Regions:
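Nucleotide-sugar donor-binding catalytic core of glycosyltransferases
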Residues: 1-3, 42-179, 187-196
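A charged, aromatic-enriched C-terminal amphipathic alpha-helix characteristic of glycosyltransferases
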Residues: 225-255
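C-terminal catalytic/acceptor-binding lobe
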Residues: 232, 427-497
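N-proximal low-complexity "stem/linker" segments adjacent to membrane-targeting elements
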Residues: 249-285
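Short, acidic, metal-binding catalytic loop of nucleotide-sugar glycosyltransferases
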Residues: 284-293
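Glycine-rich, basic loop-to-helix element that forms the pyrophosphate-binding segment
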Residues: 330-347
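Short aromatic/hydrophobic "clamp" motif used to bind/position activated sugar donors
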Residues: 352
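Conserved donor NDP-sugar-binding/catalytic core segment of glycosyltransferases
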Residues: 364-395
Length: 497
């Protein structure tokens, strides 16, 4: 400690650069680290309740709350559904002495481990000390500790994790594991805390009794739609707000007064159509997107009436997050591939999202698709698992279940293509009107590209009763044979999150 304090004293006297310190162990080690924190020009703390204490005990220029976050390069949902899964897990340590509040919580929060025959990874298993031994009823479920890399794999292997809170009153301090699990697509059931409720309300269910904990776990394990929706909400919340890039932006803003780089890149929706009967669906699909920065480029068949085009432009330009609308006109002889390439060349966005005119794209579709590039390492993303509505039979069928969050997918639906513009300039569409999507996929793979099949939410494919409506004229019974029936038209909301 003395050597560190002497080094900080010398650094403060010899350098004009700000000293930034982060105490990630607040509030437990507030007093322990105070002699060090007094040298900081800017202090960041995991517990907002400690801000006044730092202001009273240091001369820091600023004191700011900064919660934990997730490194989505390590903790993410990639390929989670392609691994054999177990049901329920708790990872951590037990203290038979001290930590009375934590011990009380564990007394009821671990009951689901017994009821659902889960697993406990004991962080203190290497210490043969009775102080750290789990109570007798939980010991049959205890497994040895694993290192962090192994734990990140386990995050994806279990359907549900349990969490307890050593700190319950802080509005910002909670286990880092909660962020990492949600980033991995794994729902968490937790004992109550102010931080959990402030940051993950509606995402992390909390329990105050053993029965509540068992009921919350039971619903996640046995209600498939509830599990998937909870998983997707957690991924989105962490990817948008709780990555270390977000925390880095906060540090730059506080220390250097630099505006954060949190503005998301411009995304260009390209849509080629000759069917003006889908006018209202096109407007709704695009205008309801929650992604904050959108450009729209249409490639229209020259049969579209001028007044309809003018109305379309006018309505979309009134949407606050749509920054530019551009219309390109083409003769009937132009191929679909040619029109798409022209729209992409005109695009100013970093990302290109290909929309079809007759499918449904729900509000968080574009936001979630672009977030996948934060962690997937993909060159092109889309959906291989998605619901299709068969108009003739009013059936909703989930196509290709089990291919969600799949990196290395050989296929994604053309109507769901999202890629950086640079990739689609490297692998442009062929001059054809059928099979142009599959051709891009094949050439992408041949060029060493990585294709990511994302979640199955917020997009529903439309199959008309008359197959002549589609360029791919597969009969409806093909979809029913190769997919899984999941409802009817009234069940669309099950696939929107």
């Amino acid at each position: 400690m003395r050597a560190l304090l002497e080094m900080l004293e010398e650094l403060r006297e010899s350098s004009n650069k700000p000293i930034v310190m982060i105490n990630k162990e607040d509030p437990l080690h507030f007093d322990k680290f105070m002699p060090i924190m007094k040298f900081a020009d800017h202090i960041f703390t995991t517990d907002e309740d400690m801000i006044d204490g730092y202001r009273q005990n240091t001369d820091a220029l600023s004191v700011t709350a900064m919660p934990f976050a997730a490194n989505m390069a390590l903790t993410n949902p990639v390929n989670r559904v392609r691994e054999q899964t177990e049901d329920l897990c708790f990872a951590g340590s037990y203290y038979s002495e001290g930590h009375d509040e934590r011990k009380r919580q564990m007394g009821y929060m671990l009951e689901p481990i017994v009821e659902f025959k889960g697993a406990i990874f004991d962080r203190m298993s290497v210490h043969d000390n009775p102080r750290y031994h789990f109570p007798e009823r939980f010991r049959p479920f205890v497994r040895p500790a694993v290192d962090f890399r192994q734990m990140t794999q386990l995050y994806r292997r279990f359907k549900v994790f349990l969490n307890v809170n050593t700190i319950v009153t802080s509005p910002t301090m909670m286990s880092r594991r909660v962020y990492e699990l949600l980033a991995s697509g794994t729902p968490v059931v937790s004992s109550p805390s102010r931080a959990i409720e402030a940051h993950f309300d509606g995402i992390v269910p909390t329990a105050s009794t053993a029965r509540q904990a068992c009921d919350a776990v039971d619903r996640l394990l046995n209600d498939d739609r509830h599990w998937w929706k909870t998983s997707q909400k957690g991924i989105r919340e962490v990817a948008l707000k709780h990555q270390y890039a977000n925390r880095g932006n906060l540090v730059r803003k506080v220390v250097f007064d630099q505006d954060s780089a949190e503005t998301q890149p411009l995304a260009t929706i390209v849509l080629s159509t000759k069917r003006s009967q889908f006018f209202e669906r096109i407007v709704k699909n695009i205008s309801q997107q929650t992604y904050p920065r959108i450009e729209v480029i249409f490639a229209f068949h020259d049969s579209w009436p001028e007044e309809r085009i003018a109305e379309l432009e006018n309505r979309l330009k009134q949407v606050s997050n749509i920054q530019r609308v551009r219309v390109l006109r083409f003769p009937g002889t132009a191929s679909l591939g040619t029109k798409l390439n022209a729209a992409i060349a005109e695009a100013k966005g970093e990302f290109i999202a290909k929309f079809d005119d007759d499918d449904w794209y729900f509000p968080n579709y574009l936001q979630d698709m672009i977030l996948t590039f934060d962690f997937s390492g993909a060159d092109l993303a889309g959906k291989w698992s998605f619901p299709v509505w068969l108009e003739g039979s009013d059936r909703l069928v989930l196509r290709n279940p089990g291919n969600e969050h799949r990196l290395g997918s050989p296929y994604v639906a053309g109507a769901t293509f999202v890629a950086r513009k640079s990739w689609l300039q490297k692998i442009p569409f062929a001059d054809r009107s059928q099979g142009e999507d599959t051709d891009v996929l094949k050439r992408s793979l041949a060029a060493g590209g990585k294709i990511y099949s994302a979640d199955h939410f917020n997009f529903i494919n439309y199959r008309a009763a008359d197959v002549r409506h589609h360029t791919w004229r597969a009969e409806s019974d093909l979809f029913e044979r190769t997919g899984r029936a999941v409802g009817r038209r009234d069940d669309f909301q099950d696939w929107v999150v």
